[in-house]
Amino acid sequence: MKQLEELLSTSFDIQFNDLTLLETAFTHTSYANEHRLLNVSHNERLEFLGDAVLQLIISEYLFAKYPKKTEGDMSKLRSMIVREESLAGFSRFCSFDAYIKLGKGEEKSGGRRRDTILGDLFEAFLGALLLDKGIDAVRRFLKQVMIPQVEKGNFERVRDYKTCLQEFLQTKGDVAIDYQVISEKGPAHAKQFEVSIVVNGAVLSKGLGKSKKLAEQDAAKNALAQLSEV
């Protein structure tokens, strides 16, 4: 934890008062499960809080930045900015991936590189920062880390995989595309959806996500990857 404290202080001018919050933010459920007897806390609740404050701050930014954009346009752009892949990228940019505590099995299976885990970690850190320093500290951190990328327009070029897949399949003729929810697991604040894409009655691909929409996008992305190999 000492190295993480030094990283936050030197890179982002952040010094936590409650180090327990910081440690919890960087503790994955797999680690907590392996240390149940020690009553170790994990970061899912902080992730829930961080997701909410991130949505609020990015919404405020977009509302002020784009006075002529419609609600629908701003919602799309916000979704691009806070999508799992983006948040995982910011975790890596901040070197957070080096400090998360994972269970042995999760570590061996490549969890430290997994977008889902790193995206959740970024949100959990925001939740911990909110509780320790307040919302203005979260705003300052996001202005330093995320907003410059938004200003460059990097997120406006993110692909809508569902639209790309539909356009690709339409070039092959008349096709019927159906997105079907296979499973829905986890508590209300940490859902995990699995979705399949059925094309003309046959399963083309599957995807995972924290919402139906994210799972559909993941399934479409996987389908495009498969089709590019054919």
Swiss-Prot record:
Reactions accelerated catalytically: Endonucleolytic cleavage to 5'-phosphomonoester
GO biological process: mRNA processing; regulation of gene expression; rRNA processing; tRNA processing
Name listed for the protein in its UniProt record: Ribonuclease 3
DRBM domain segment(s): 160-229
EC code(s) of this entry: 3.1.26.3
Organism: Streptococcus pyogenes serotype M28 (strain MGAS6180)
Gene3D superfamilies: 3.30.160.20, Ribonuclease III domain
NCBIfam families linked to this entry: RNaseIII (TIGR02191)
Alphabetically ordered keywords of this record: Cytoplasm, Endonuclease, Hydrolase, Magnesium, Metal-binding, mRNA processing, Nuclease, RNA-binding, rRNA processing, rRNA-binding, tRNA processing
PANTHER family the UniProt entry points to: RIBONUCLEASE 3 (PTHR11207:SF0), RIBONUCLEASE III (PTHR11207)
